[in-house]
């Protein structure tokens, strides 16, 4: 009898404690969205938005991920929601995207409250296709975080221009009587922000006079889309040879890096199979040999944890479906009589083709741009120029190397940097890659989405493992030129092909 009372009172006290914690978390959040029902049947989810605010949402215990996502989209009044997702960390510190078809409690094990973050899931290959001003604003906030955290590197000149666009969008036109060079030091744009960069940003800001916040954000996105690592979802893996590699998921295909050197690009139409088992990911690629016959190449990668392997596989399936297909693959209505092994995961959202074709911008939308976090000012030792904007040149405040290329300003992150190459339906040469961001003479996107071939560097691919890089042959340039000419005639200008490409996924 005593044990019964202890269990009963213990459960009651636990429920009261959970209810107090839920109310406390709801009070901390800037916005609280309640749900009908008693505390026993409610869970609390706390979502951090891109502008730094928090939203606390109460949902039924058996609520699925799509219900929480819909609540956040309704709160933001966001129509182009397919570019975004809710992200959370598991107990193994592996990041996951919330699956809308599954229960929240079965996915997010740490809680309640269950903490998630709103993030850009698919970076638009062409930001001009984003119809809503609110969508472009959220993209800018995400890119600002990527650059500040070091995830997305950019050269000095590009960083100065992007920061100046941020100032123009947030503060408006430069005013001589109100704004001083020290103002820039109150903001944070890059991991290592020097006084020299702040003066360059201040001078560049003067040149953007007259731009509205919407225009400045559009110019920001059109500049940021040419960064080499824009929209690349990186995953660290190990190959059979024991070396570390990185796989980057892009709208075009899967990039392969060895250290900071890009050694290959598997285009989605050339990938015939992509599956996983425990912590092993298998990638099968079809490529034409010298005689024009198709040959299969199998690559096996290993990850540190089975959950990380499944997460990489799911991200690859979603990237392929979103950027390559006209619509998601429909699930078969009949069930097989046999036991089915493997994951049943399928991408169920809209594709980029559907998003750009169906979404229409509203006539009038209103939202509030929240100010950036401010820091204490620094006393600048260098003086900014007081000349007119048309007489200013950012290059006066930028140090250059002896060969005329721009110095890299930031500490290199763990992510590799790929050189920018001119887009077009031909193979791109991958040799003599620059070690510093911004040292390339080109300022273009890395790969055109219309290219439907497998790109390789000067190294010979091994069907079992990725071998260490070997010195390029002296006739390598002629070899690449011949294959470029050959592949020029087999490309097709199809931007959104059908359900071909990936099988057995």
Swiss-Prot record:
Modified residues (Phosphoserine): 39
Primary location group: cytoplasm
Region span, Disordered: 357-406
Membrane topology designation: Peripheral membrane protein
Residue intervals of the FERM domain: 43-327
Record GO terms (molecular function): cytoskeletal protein binding
Residue ranges, annotated region (Required for interaction with CRB1): 29-119
Biased composition regions of type Polar residues, renumbered to the chain: 394-406
GO biological process: actomyosin structure organization
Annotated GO CC locations: adherens junction; cytoplasm; cytoskeleton; photoreceptor inner segment; plasma membrane
Listed PROSITE patterns: FERM_1, FERM_2, FERM_3
Keyword line: Cell junction, Cell membrane, Cytoplasm, Membrane, Phosphoprotein
Protein's cellular compartments: Cytoplasm; Cell junction, Adherens junction; Cell membrane; Photoreceptor inner segment
InterPro entries reported for this sequence: Band_41_domain, Ez/rad/moesin-like, FA, FERM/acyl-CoA-bd_prot_sf, FERM_2, FERM_central, FERM_CS, FERM_domain
Free-text function comment from the UniProt entry: Plays a role in the formation and organization of tight junctions during the establishment of polarity in epithelial cells.
Record's subunit section: Component of a complex composed of PALS1, CRB1 and EPB41L5. Within the complex, interacts (via FERM domain) with PALS1 (via HOOK domain) and with CRB1 (via intracellular domain). Interacts with CRB2 (via intracellular domain). Interacts with CRB3 (via intracellular domain).
Name assigned to this protein: Band 4.1-like protein 5
Lineage: Eukaryota, Metazoa, Chordata, Craniata, Vertebrata
Gene transcribed to yield this protein: EPB41L5
